[in-house]
Amino acid sequence: MTTITGLTVRDIRIPTSESLTGSDAMNPDPDYSAAYVELLTDHPAGLKGHGLAFTIGRGNELCAAAIEAWKPFILGQSLEEIRGDMRSFWRRMTRDSQLRWVGPEKGTVHMASAAIINA
């Protein structure tokens, strides 16, 4: 059985607004950003998972903070149990009684959950 032993998250930002790279009528000054998550395991081969939630700048720290908030729910989980019932894992994350007020299955909660699940 492979167990998740660590979770790190980084708030990565690329100053694309300086050159207006990726700008358009709706997004005049985007700074391409990502809340990047890495899951560590006890697998003998050093198995890791990587995922991200892509944003265009402001608010990226909210996704990173939401990922950090789920750390206690993730650490100690077995990959086999998660893969065996992804639906329950998704619901456990997006329907937490104290975190769901941030946006159940939408917005920050949805993006942060997706980053963890993709990792």
Give the label of every model feature segment.
Residues 1-57:
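Structured beta-strand/loop patches that form or line metal/cofactor-binding pockets in enzymes
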Residues 6, 40-119:
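Metal- or metallocofactor-binding catalytic centers and their adjacent structured scaffolds
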